[in-house]
UniProtKB/Swiss-Prot annotation:
It is found in: Nucleus speckle; Nucleus. It comes from Mus musculus (Mouse). This is WW domain-containing adapter protein with coiled-coil. Residues 38-50, 158-174, 182-191, 226-239 have a biased composition (Basic and acidic residues). Gene3D superfamilies: 2.20.70.10. Interacts (via coiled coil domain) with RNF20, RNF40 and UBE2A. Interacts (via WW domain) with RNA polymerase II. Interacts with MTOR and other components of the MTOR pathway including RPTOR, RUVBL1, RUVBL2, TTI1 and TTI2. Residues 1-138, 158-352, 428-541 are annotated as: Disordered. Residues 23-37, 61-75, 211-225, 284-300, 316-331, 428-463, 490-503, 528-541 have a biased composition (Polar residues).
């Protein structure tokens, strides 16, 4: 405190006015009660320049002053001035108390804010640091608005061009949000900040707030009067409707949507509201669910499963989130279904639509509309019977015939009871045969994986699955989901084998077969991931045909004669033992071969050394022979000389 008092006298004697700009840190650190406005602009300037924390750890705008000034005691005034300037800069946006705390702002990874529900949604910046964030809006003493840049300390009357560019960018992104595919994102970060959008700001840019896991329901969204709290599945603070029958506790499933619209980490709740619900489809466009016919966003995005019937026919699926159909009118909502084993990547747009009665994706999209038209035209028929028809008619052929009758003659041209009997006959025909589900039969109540057009393989979730237990409201048999099994390449054939092995026509809970979709293009692509659900009471799992499908497509005549049971004895053998044996034999052969080769190499070296010795001995002998010849010549000369002398 003594040093603090001495510094205070130095700063107040005019030295601060001369050298304040060159030493902003000194002015920032020791600005006190007598100088509430001296370090005011320097708070603005040094907040960005001297911030030690990276931008993805704390919010730049909502940095709490307590983090920086907590070591000294006389800075209450500076804190108030700083928070007041932050509020003035944002044009009077009032912050929620959670937003100004350090533990909350450390959870965010983008520069977005969360405002009170009564105000407009606050702005979203595109990057972790945007140059438009330096500008703030103030009101001058004459009452006019002016804009101040805290980094360059420039004031001007007109709106800064960074703001105009950002508004233009966000408007364009809002226009393109319906048709655009998601960019490659950091999906872990997206799980952490489950973002929820408010799609009803008319004419303004699309703004959303990143919510952390500790947010309360009132500041997760900027709600308008038309929003309904029941449509947002909030994490850890869900607003359950009064008749919520089933809750599925599953691990977070990522929705990489262009404008994030659903909360990925939420436990999904089935809500039976008897009122028209607003819901967000996978591309962020909000669609009113009163429409009984498929709107323009329905073909581009493969609408949800068939809606489960009210009353005793309560079908609860372990992986899907079906909305219950109300008694007054069917509301086909556009909420995308999420399975625990498949991440719905961006829906495939129907750029080239195949013929109507051959593309099973169109069958899937037309199901809610067909239900609605059935109920509108046959108001005296029980809606559960219609749902039974559409549930039981899972084969391609029967669904083709039903939809063909719908499209040509209308629903009044045939009898509903005949359809029910036909579907029951189909299901009883295929029930005794214990065949595994085909990958492309049009099952109206099973989850599927969307296939991104950029990546032609199905995107599967890498999060390990917990066993999903869902308890239906009527029957008490839980269903457990078995883990994912890869299947071989499956071709996208138009007509498939009529298999309804798991379907019961009675009011027991239907065990949904997780038959997954390939892309809308009719071409062979890598096979989907199968998840098979079975009743936990019987604990029987439908056998997966791991490599049953041949590479070529089955013609209808071949599909009629094809039987999985005939080739089941050669499928799925445990290969671990054979692989271990083969690897052991390979290693042994390798070791024996190396030993043998090393022996041969040593023998070769020995023989080469012997050859070298022989060569050396041969040269020595030659040298000796030459030497001896030389000696013989010399001796003969000496003989001759001696003979002459004698």
């Amino acid at each position: 405190m003594v040093m603090y008092a001495r510094k205070q006298q130095r700063l107040s004697d005019g030295c601060h006015d001369r050298r304040g700009d060159s030493q902003p840190f000194q002015a920032l650190k020791y600005s006190s009660k007598s100088h509430p406005s001296s370090g005011d602009h320097r708070h603005e300037k040094m907040r960005d320049a001297a911030d030690p924390s990276p931008p993805n750890k704390m919010l730049r705008r909502s940095n709490s002053p307590e983090n920086k000034y907590s070591d000294s005691t006389g800075h209450n005034k500076a804190k108030n001035v700083h928070t007041q300037r932050v509020r003035e800069r944002d044009g009077g946006t009032s912050y929620s108390p959670q937003e100004n705390s350090h533990n909350h702002s450390a959870l965010h990874s983008s520069n977005s804010h969360s405002s009170n529900p009564s105000n407009n949604p606050s702005k979203t910046s595109d990057a972790p640091y945007d140059s438009a964030d330096d500008w703030s809006e103030h009101i001058s003493s004459s009452g006019k608005k002016y804009y101040y840049n805290c980094r360059t300390e420039v004031s001007q009357w007109e709106k800064p061009k960074e703001w105009l560019e950002r508004e233009q960018r966000q408007k364009e992104a809002n226009k393109l949000a319906v048709n655009s595919f998601p960019k490659d994102r950091d999906y872990r970060r997206e799980v952490m900040q489950a973002t929820a959008t408010s799609g009803f700001t008319s004419g303004m840019e699309d703004k959303h707030s990143s919510d952390a896991s500790s947010l309360l329901p009132q500041n997760i969204l900027s709600q308008t009067s038309r929003h309904n709290d029941k449509d947002y599945r909030l994490p850890r603070a869900e607003t359950h409707s009064s008749s919520t029958p089933v809750q599925h506790p599953i691990k977070p499933v990522v929705h990489p949507t262009a404008t994030p619209s659903t909360v990925p980490s939420s436990p999904f709740t089935l809500q039976s509201d008897h009122q028209p619900k607003k819901s967000f489809d996978a591309n962020g466009a909000s669609t009113l669910s009163k429409l009984p016919t498929p709107t323009a966003s329905l073909p581009a995005q493969k609408t949800e499963r068939k809606e489960s019937a009210p009353g005793d026919k309560s079908i609860s699926h372990s992986c899907t989130t079906p909305s219950t159909s109300s008694a007054s009118g069917l509301n086909p909502t556009s909420a995308p279904p999420t399975s625990a084993s498949a991440v719905p990547v961006s829906p495939v747009p129907q750029s080239t639509i195949p013929p109507l009665l051959q593309d099973p994706n169109l069958f899937r999209q037309l199901l809610p509309a067909l239900q609605a038209t059935l109920q509108l035209n046959n108001s005296n028929v029980d809606i559960s019977k219609i749902n039974e028809v559409l549930t039981a008619a899972v084969t391609q052929a029967s669904l083709q015939s039903i939809i063909h009758k719908f499209l040509t003659a209308g629903p009044s041209a045939f009898n509903i009871t005949s359809l029910i009997s036909q579907a029951a006959q189909l299901s009883t025909q295929a029930q005794p045969s214990n065949q595994s589900p085909m990958s492309l039969t049009s099952d109206a109540s099973s989850p599927r994986s969307y296939v991104s057009p950029r990546i032609s393989t199905p995107q599967t979730n890498t999060v390990p699955m917990k066993p999903l237990i869902s308890t239906p409201p009527v029957s008490s048999q839980p269903k457990v989901s078995t883990p994912v099994v890869k299947q071989g390449p499956v071709s996208h054939s138009a007509t498939q084998q009529p298999v309804t092995a798991d379907k019961q026509q009675s009011h027991d809970p239907v065990s949904p077969r997780s038959l997954q979709r390939l892309s809308s293009q009719r071409s062979p692509s890598p096979g989907p991931n199968h998840t098979c659900s079975s009743n936990a009471s019987t604990a029987t799992v439908v056998p997966q045909n791991a490599s049953a499908r041949p590479a070529c497509s089955l013609t209808p005549t071949l599909a009629a004669h094809f039987n999985d049971n005939l080739i089941k004895h050669v499928q799925g053998w445990p290969a671990d033992h054979a692989e271990k044996q083969a690897s052991r034999l390979r290693e042994e052969a390798h070791n024996m071969g190396s030993v043998h080769m090393s022996e041969i190499c040593t023998e070769l070296k020995n023989l080469r050394s012997l050859v070298r010795v022989c060569e050396i001995q041969a040269t020595l002998r030659e040298q000796r022979i030459l030497f001896l010849r030389q000696q013989i010549k010399e001796l003969e000369k000496l003989k001759n000389q001696n003979s002459f002398m004698v």
